[in-house]
């Protein structure tokens, strides 16, 4: 059956339909309005004053049922001239439906009668028809009503949850969380809205649901990460609380109350697991929050979930972590101690504390391969810590008892091993095999003590005899006198004569061992002296052999004479080098040992100190340059400085000061430089010159060796030693008695000839380099050269000694020497020009004070530089070309 519900028809059409007796199909009918419920709803809404205002279309548009109804209404109104007939429109539609239904029932009645149904049956079937129609309409109504209630309830719950979440994250207005203003105002409660009248138009349930779905993405996207971090902190804190099992002093009362209201650890772990499983699924996450909204949104544990709450939670966790770490480290330390003691005792830990507790104790410190972000915590409560302490104390007591027992047994073993002279290999093997504190090791050590005691009973007499022999040997080594030995001998004889039992023999043996120990301590101090005495005796033997060999003249005629001489030279060097050191060290050691030993040391029946003095005198007599004198002199100087506290002032000669003997008259001394390090003084007698030969000579780069008898010297005033000074200052006269104190520093000759050239050349220039025509440089003749060679090889054997004889000839020869064209390398003479254009001669002087005494007056003869220079000068003189033959 089709019914027209679109709009009222014209009266003419309606009449035609009634007369025709058939159902008329209205071309403007809309299928969405083809139900009685819809029509009823439209009729009920016709009385609403807001109906026309809420219609979102204009009156003359024909796109929707409401548009058609409004258009037809105005059409009928203008045609009939009636007032507002909205109710009449819906009533006419229902009249048409009822008429169609009536006609349908009439036709159905005709069919029933033709079939032959009775009136009762026909009435029953009509009731069924009306009941079915009524139930169908009622079913649609109930479905719509249920949908309405469901949407209203879901929207209300989700809206309430979202608003509670915004309060938990400290954003009740949603400004920080929801960026869309329309969505934010659609889901917020009226008291949380920033714009109370928004939205102006009420939303349908489906529109509100769509707005809530959009808002859930923003709210849950901000809330779930915070909730996940907060749950992790809560779970960590719960683990720590369960491990420590007590409130710590660093927490406030509010913290303790909040901790007491936390859900159980299993509940928090389940919450975190559901959040991880629903990650990325808004539906599952929303369902999780709805199911657990009593704890998450209503409970005090989740009252505020933001960065500040997480930060505060981490501070509480830090307090518990510090306490846990302290206790955990203590447990680990005690665990290591327990394991070490059990290993030393050789006893399994399970037999002492039980298997369960042993497994729990072993679990501490063992890393577990877990993928969870939350660390694993071990129980460190007071009860567990006390149990571990009791276990450790028990093991320490057992360890101490066994260690003391082993120490006593090992002391007995050590004494017996020493007395019985057991080999070290056996002792090391035994101690290595019994290093633990197990009952088996203690039993083996006890058996070893018993075995050694049995051996001692059999060998104690021999041990006493060996100890007595060793004591006598040490007495001889330490040179003990009979008086020093007599005290112990008396005690020893008394104990030995009265010893009849094993205990008395042990007392005698112990007395001998104590004496041995005392003598060995003295021997330790005496060993360095023994070593020096041995060296002293060896050097004496070498000296005696050297004397005997030197007296045998036939050794020079033997075939291996060179080997004999080489051996003698090695012995001589060994004596001169090592004998002084041995003598000095031995004397020092003897002085140190005077307070430790009662009697003096003897050497070949004489006191060792006397033998040392005699030997030192012999060495000084035979080897004057030996180190004995030098070391003793040095030692004497050091002692004088320490005792008298006198500091000797030494004057060092520099380039601007020259050391000159006191009383020297420079006017009477004509000094001419012949070599860089040698000088002769003109105007001195031959005897005086012989004394001058003993003066110490200086070379550049060599040390200064002074005479043993030093005399006082002073520095000459600068006005006197100035090169250009020509004043009338009286120069000191030369004192012959003090000529030996002349310094070897070069002097500048202040008396110059008319045509003298300075500085004077030490060797003549060859004739082929000199222009003989008009040259003022004289030539060296054969006669003068021979005189020079004769003087250089005089009786003194010194090259630099000059005789006053034939003084004029020497002056003529000196005038014939020319200026050098180039100074040799390493020369002490440096020629420079002053700003006034005058030549200046600078003499470089290096005086080095020697800390050793001079032991030879011919030291310079062995100087390498001096010999080289001497050979050069002689070769140059031999290379002269003589013109006068």
From Swiss-Prot:
<keyword id="KW-0597">Phosphoprotein</keyword>
<protein>
    <recommendedName>
        <fullName>Anaphase spindle elongation protein</fullName>
    </recommendedName>
</protein>
<keyword id="KW-0206">Cytoskeleton</keyword>
<comment type="subunit">
    <text>Interacts with CDC48; the interaction is likely to result in CDC5 degradation.</text>
</comment>
<dbReference type="InterPro" id="IPR007145">
    <property type="entry name" value="MAP65_Ase1_PRC1"/>
</dbReference>
<feature type="compositionally biased region" description="Basic and acidic residues">
    <location>
        <begin position="799"/>
        <end position="812"/>
    </location>
</feature>
<dbReference type="GO" id="GO:0008017">
    <property type="term" value="F:microtubule binding"/>
</dbReference>
<keyword id="KW-0963">Cytoplasm</keyword>
<comment type="similarity">
    <text>Belongs to the MAP65/ASE1 family.</text>
</comment>
<dbReference type="GO" id="GO:0005880">
    <property type="term" value="C:nuclear microtubule"/>
</dbReference>
<dbReference type="GO" id="GO:0005819">
    <property type="term" value="C:spindle"/>
</dbReference>
<feature type="modified residue" description="Phosphoserine">
    <location>
        <position position="17"/>
    </location>
</feature>
<comment type="function">
    <text>Required for anaphase spindle elongation.</text>
</comment>
<dbReference type="GO" id="GO:0000920">
    <property type="term" value="P:septum digestion after cytokinesis"/>
</dbReference>
<dbReference type="GO" id="GO:0051255">
    <property type="term" value="P:spindle midzone assembly"/>
</dbReference>
<dbReference type="Pfam" id="PF03999">
    <property type="entry name" value="MAP65_ASE1"/>
</dbReference>
<keyword id="KW-0493">Microtubule</keyword>
<dbReference type="GO" id="GO:0051256">
    <property type="term" value="P:mitotic spindle midzone assembly"/>
</dbReference>
<feature type="region of interest" description="Disordered">
    <location>
        <begin position="724"/>
        <end position="759"/>
    </location>
</feature>
<dbReference type="GO" id="GO:0005737">
    <property type="term" value="C:cytoplasm"/>
</dbReference>
<dbReference type="GO" id="GO:0007052">
    <property type="term" value="P:mitotic spindle organization"/>
</dbReference>
<dbReference type="GO" id="GO:0005874">
    <property type="term" value="C:microtubule"/>
</dbReference>
<feature type="compositionally biased region" description="Low complexity">
    <location>
        <begin position="734"/>
        <end position="745"/>
    </location>
</feature>
<dbReference type="GO" id="GO:0072686">
    <property type="term" value="C:mitotic spindle"/>
</dbReference>
<dbReference type="GO" id="GO:0000226">
    <property type="term" value="P:microtubule cytoskeleton organization"/>
</dbReference>
<dbReference type="GO" id="GO:0000022">
    <property type="term" value="P:mitotic spindle elongation"/>
</dbReference>
<dbReference type="GO" id="GO:0001578">
    <property type="term" value="P:microtubule bundle formation"/>
</dbReference>
<dbReference type="GO" id="GO:1990023">
    <property type="term" value="C:mitotic spindle midzone"/>
</dbReference>
<feature type="region of interest" description="Disordered">
    <location>
        <begin position="1"/>
        <end position="30"/>
    </location>
</feature>
<feature type="region of interest" description="Disordered">
    <location>
        <begin position="789"/>
        <end position="812"/>
    </location>
</feature>
<dbReference type="GO" id="GO:0000073">
    <property type="term" value="P:initial mitotic spindle pole body separation"/>
</dbReference>
